[in-house]
Structure formats: C-alpha cells, structure tokens
From Swiss-Prot:
PHB and PHBV are desirable bioplastic due to their biodegradability, biocompatibility, and mechanical properties. However, PHBV has better mechanical properties than PHB. The keyword Ubl conjugation does not apply. Pfam families: Abhydrolase_1, HHH_5. Pathway: Biopolymer metabolism; poly-(R)-3-hydroxybutanoate biosynthesis. Keywords: Acyltransferase, PHA biosynthesis, PHB biosynthesis, Transferase. It comes from the Archaea. The active site is at C162 (charge relay system), D317 (charge relay system), H346 (charge relay system). Its EC number is 2.3.1.-. This is Poly(3-hydroxyalkanoate) polymerase subunit PhaC. GO terms for biological process: poly(3-hydroxyalkanoate) biosynthetic process; poly-hydroxybutyrate biosynthetic process.
Length: 475
C-alpha cells in the first residue's frame, strides 16, 4: 500500500495553481501577440543587392552585386566562370536569399563566385500556351547567352533548383557546349514509383493535368499551395502554429517564421501548357529518365550530359525524395558525378542553419574546383537601348505574350529611327539566340527578315514555323 495516499485537498490546490500559471502565461503571451504579428509583417526577404541585366516577357535575369552586399573577396579568389541559378516555375526565388545568414546566394558570393539567377515571375493569361520548349530552348538559352557574353566564358556553371533543376537537365542535354558544370538541388528526375506522395497524387490514374488547364488556363497558385500543404497536413496546419505559440516571445524565431510564411503564401501561377507537359512527360511517363523526352521534336539526349554533375538531396524531402534523384547519375554519360544527401527536408536545403554551415561551403568548393575558366569569347547578344545599369532592355516584351502578333509600336519605331536599319532582335520574340542564328545566315535587319517565308526562317533559326510566322506578322 502506498505511504502517500491520495489527498483530494492537495490535488485541488495543485490544479488551481497550474490553472493560474497557465492563465498567467496566456495573458503574457497575449500582451506580445500584436507586437509579434507586426514584426512578422515587417520582415524583409531577398535583400542581397542585384541588378536586372536582361528581361524577356515576364522573366528577369538578376546579377548579384557582392560589393554592394558588403562581401569582400580578394581578386585571386574570384572565380571566372559564373553560376546561373535556374529557379522553379513555382513560388518566388527569394527562398534562396531569405535572410543574410540563410542565403544560398550569399554563400556562393562569399566563396568568390559570380552569381546570376532567373526570376521567372508570374505568367499572364496570355502566357498559358508557353511550352517547356519555350522555357528551355528560348528563355533559358537566351539567359545563358547573356551570362556567357557578360563573363566572356564559352561555358558557364548551372545550379537548378527543384523544377528548375529538371529543366536544367533538359537544357544541358540540348546545349552541352554552353554548360561547364551542372548542379541539381532537389530535382525530380526519376519517377518509377520513387517520387513519393507527389508522384502518387500526380498519377494518370487519379489526376489529369489537362483537365486543370482546360478549366483555369494557367494552374492557380492557390491550388498548388494547398496541394503541397496537404502532403504533410499535421505539420502545415497544426504543429508549426503550436511551435509559433510556444516561441512567440523569441523575436528571432518570430522573424524567421514570418519570412517562411511570407514565402509560402507568395505562390505564382504556372503556365498551363508547360505544366501539362511536365506532369505528363516527366511524372506520369518518366520520359526524361528513360531518355525518351523530346522538346519540339528535339531529343533530350542524356548521353550528352558528360560534364561534372552534382546532386543535392534532402534526406527527409517529402516533395522530391532522394530516390527520385539518385538513379539519374546512372543514366548520364558523365564520369564525374557526386551526390550529397543532407539530413534535412526540401526547403531545409535552402534555409536550415546546418546546411549553411556545412553543405553550401562544400558546394561552393565543388564549383571552384571545376571552374578553371576559358579564353574570352565574343557572343553576339544584341538588344534595344541599354538601360543605365547596363541591362539588356527588352521592357517592351514584359507585358506581351511571346506569341503575340501585335505590330511593333509605331511611336517607338519613329523615336529609335536612325540611318541604320532595325536589327532583327527588335522584333518581339527574337532574343539573342535566334538573332545569332539569323545573323549567321546573313539575316541582319528587319528588311532582310521580310524577304524570307516562315518555313525557311524556322529552319534557319531552329524553331517552329508558327513562331517564325509570328515574327513576320509584326513586320
């Protein structure tokens, strides 16, 4: 028999004491709640200084300024070969530059790398017919050419994040001569019952991406956000808010929480046709891994990927499990491949303190060891008038669908008129890559362009006949 029998009077006092403590804690928490909510709303993200050096349709190519960021690197430690970060078409890229001590961009700058990033921005309804070919063989290729031209390198380093990593694989297979090294971060590449919940939900047995696009045009950000959150509903709808309440008095925790919530709620729509292609060809049919993928009739041949390849994976990534990435290294031609599986999740690869202490310095070193540089090359990247910050000014494209057939603005044409005929890149839709191909064929001016029919231009520029016809319709 117990020597301490139950004492109802003492139990009642203990219950009362505990209740008073809880009430006191709740009162103290409520006093700081409004202040903490204001703090969450005032946090800054994406603070590393950058300049927009190229624009096309909605995309902006950012060049980060280490000096303006207060990052001092000795000249002998600066790398000649730049890194182009290719972000996903989903969400905003500032998850890679969330705050100073948790910024992938800053870690690379601190290691002496010259860093660029493609910010796709949000497509309009006019962009719903953009395809993966548009994103990979037009937009990405134009951005790569700008970076090559600015750096004087014939091949650059690429770091692709998530969906941007998958697109970077496509690009590298089609343009291997322009890629020095290929880094992939949480990239979905192999979907043979290896992609976890996302692959199962995206199975053609349960889901038709075409039905979504037929209904909405572009895929709504809200639909995507809810779908991702429901993959781990307890964490996303319960646990994280309990943690927030328990740490409300910790200003640093509240600021970090606010930054993450801002990013999670800052989703963007995805161009409809590209979404359908990605889901059907990459997820449902696994064509990329099987080496069967084609973009606009061009084979995305994995045998062309023979440069150094680095894969970064999160051990606990529920969106892109490591098994959806690892097997890829076995089907490419490169004999210099490496995988790093870090003890974190999908987003943790970008923002966890441990990855910034241990992983990203190692990644920066990997790029440095393989960035010996090359002799300067002269890449013809012509543009309209240069902006004050030496940007490639294509602002007239920013709000125009890539397939639009509107006439070139007459007033702008008159203002820019000179004795020299207008170059072909003044036509909406002809970026540096297409312009270079046309120039090589002796087609330099708009007048030269008008002498050809769409079929011939398509062959010369290595594009579709419909796109070539769009160019002619503007003349």
């Amino acid at each position: 028999m117990s020597s301490n029998p139950f004492n109802p009077f003492e139990a009642a006092l203990n219950w009362q004491r505990k209740t008073l403590e809880n009430m006191t804690d709740a009162a103290e928490t409520s006093q700081v709640a409004d202040e903490r909510l204001e703090l969450m709303e005032s946090v800054d993200v994406g603070q590393t200084p950058s300049n927009v050096v190229y624009e096309e349709n909605k995309l902006e190519l950012l060049h980060y300024d280490a000096e303006a960021a207060g990052i001092e690197v000795p000249d002998e430690e600066k790398e000649d070969v730049p890194i182009l970060i290719v972000y996903a078409l989903i969400n905003r890229p500032y998850i890679l530059d969330l705050q100073e001590e948790r910024s992938v961009v800053r870690r690379l700058l601190e290691a002496g790398h010259d860093v660029y990033l493609i910010d796709w921005n949000e497509p309009s309804r006019l962009d719903q017919h953009l395809t993966l070919d548009d994103y990979v063989n037009r937009y990405m290729d134009n951005c790569v050419d700008v970076v090559r031209d600015r750096s004087g390198q014939d091949a650059i380093n690429i770091l692709g994040y998530c969906m941007g990593g998958t697109m970077s694989v496509m690009y590298t297979a089609l343009h291997k001569e322009k890629v020095n090294t290929l880094g992939l971060m949480a990239a979905g590449l192999c979907f043979d019952h290896t992609g976890g919940v996302l692959e199962e939900w995206g199975s053609e047995e349960y889901y038709s991406p075409q039905d979504v696009v037929d209904t909405f045009g572009n895929v709504p950000a809200d639909m995507l956000d809810i779908g991702f959150a429901l993959m781990d509903p307890v964490e996303n709808y319960v646990t994280k808010y309990i943690r927030f309440a328990e740490n409300m008095e910790n200003e640093g925790f509240v600021e970090n929480f606010g930054r993450m919530e801002q990013w999670l709620g800052d989703g963007i729509d995805v161009a409809g046709e590209a979404y359908v292609q990605f889901l059907e060809d990459v997820y449902q049919d696994n064509k990329l891994y099987k080496n069967e993928l084609e973009l606009d009739g061009k084979h995305v041949d994995l045998d062309n990927i023979d440069m150094p390849v680095l894969q970064l994976m999160g051990e606990y990534d529920h969106l892109i499990p490591p098994e959806a990435s690892k097997p890829f290294n076995d089907v490419i031609a490169s004999d210099d491949t490496r995988t790093i599986e870090f003890s974190t999740g999908h987003i943790g690869l970008s923002v966890s303190s441990s990855t910034h202490a241990d992983l990203w310095p190692e990644v920066a070193e990997w790029y440095s060891e393989r960035s010996t540089g090359s002799e300067e090359v002269d890449i013809e990247v012509e543009s309209p008038e240069a902006a004050e910050d030496d940007a490639v000014d294509q602002s007239e494209l920013t709000d125009i669908d890539v397939d639009a057939t509107d006439d070139v603005d007459a007033d702008a044409t008159e203002d820019d008129a000179t004795d020299e005929p207008a170059d072909v890149d003044s036509v909406s839709g002809i970026g540096p890559t297409y312009a270079e191909r046309l120039h090589d064929a002796g087609i330099h001016s708009v007048a030269d362009l008008a002498e050809y029919d769409a079929a011939d231009l398509a062959d010369i520029a290595e594009t579709t006949e419909s796109r070539a016809q769009d160019w002619l319709d503007q003349l």
